From Swiss-Prot:
It comes from Chromobacterium violaceum (strain ATCC 12472 / DSM 30191 / JCM 1249 / CCUG 213 / NBRC 12614 / NCIMB 9131 / NCTC 9757 / MK). Keywords: Aminoacyl-tRNA synthetase, ATP-binding, Cytoplasm, Ligase, Metal-binding, Nucleotide-binding, Protein biosynthesis, Zinc. ATP binds at residue 269. Monomer. The lineage of its organism: Bacteria, Pseudomonadati, Pseudomonadota, Betaproteobacteria, Neisseriales. This is Cysteine--tRNA ligase. Pfam families: CysS_C (PF23493), DALR_2 (PF09190), tRNA-synt_1e (PF01406). It is found in: Cytoplasm. The keyword ATP-binding applies. GO terms for cellular component: cytosol. Coiled coil: none annotated.
Amino acid sequence: MLSLYNTLTRQKEAFKPIEPGKVSMYVCGMTVYDLCHIGHARMLAAFDVIYRWLKASGYDVNYVRNITDIEDKIIKRALERGITPEQLVEETIADMRQDAAALGLLPPTHEPRATHHVGGMVAMIEQLIANGKAYPAANGDVYYAVREFEGYGKLSGRTLDKLRAGERVEVDPNKRDPLDFVLWKAAKPGEPSWDSPWGKGRPGWHIECSVMSCHHLGEHFDIHGGGEDLQFPHHENEIAQSEGAHGHQYVNYWLHNGFINVDGEKMSKSLGNFFTIRDVLQHFDGEVIRFFIVRSHYRSPVNYTDSILNDAKHGLTRLYTALRGIELPTSDGIDWNHAYAARFKAAMDDDFGTSEAVAVLFELAGEVNKSRDPQLARLLKDLGGVLGLLTRDPEVFLQGGVGEGELSAEQVEALIQARKDARAAKDWAESDRIRDELTAKGIVLEDGAGGTIWRRA
């Protein structure tokens, strides 16, 4: 049985969906004002694996990952670039989808945009006002009255008393309590705005996810996920809004992925250690990035360095090399009673334990290398596929390259043929020179009875 760590209860729990055989899951997606960075890759890949495992476990999964397409950062960046917010949003969504494809992400069931749900946001805010949980201010904003929601702080542990005692909160004369947060922002000149009972304006960030999740999954659903930085205030405020509006539990299980640090420090532009997915893709294959993320447990912090990415590349190369040269039988699906598959399943059923599952893949690859058994190789490929790995032909991965200055496959084959000709002519010096040239270019040759095969180092 699947168990998962629930941030809400701070413990592992057996997973019991609201509706047997079906899972409803919402994950906070991108605010589309800039390219996705490696931290976003962690979240995207982590919840993609969770989605895949739920599907592999036989569940019918309704997976919703939103797009925040109206927000202060979007307006500011569009102004800086001299384009409209709409132009920036469309450009950034296209970039995001290219990055998602490079990481091998499955598309979510639904990918709603905030601007398509403003009417629902207005309706929820009206309900919150009617329930005494929110109030319009004189400046045209609408605020959530946090003191009116008894359970505030239950997700993050940051209760109102702790917040007032431990954090400096800027006083705003429009708020009844400095900790109240905005649900609706009054329109400012030149900014996108919508009509509402409180005048023209736009929704606050937190209300967007409450409305989009409930629209697609209902007022009470199974799983809500996101990065651990969203626990507070975003997810805490989502709970206050949704439960304040509907009067019952919003989400049963809250999942949060850990951060990616760069050389042991938090990634930030000011430290000069900020990497977009595009930056990393210039040097590493997208599947290598995915493997780097997947081989660590989703809740653990992960350190990013070039040497660690190179180690991930070598690890994935080992797995693909085990499949090389074996004609695989057609897959009949995974037999979960097989010893390796059963261990893989036990790891994944324990809070999506990908690090242990990857260890099983390496053990299985070692067995395949020894036996060259097509059935074991098929199992290796199928189990890897559950994690979104090993989905390509081994030759495509092993001989594919990224980065400038690398030899093309055609150039490598031509040099291998020249080396073969030199060996046939017993010109050993030329043969060695060509091998050394290929080695210097990162090409590994393996001579065997069937000829020479190659891969990139």
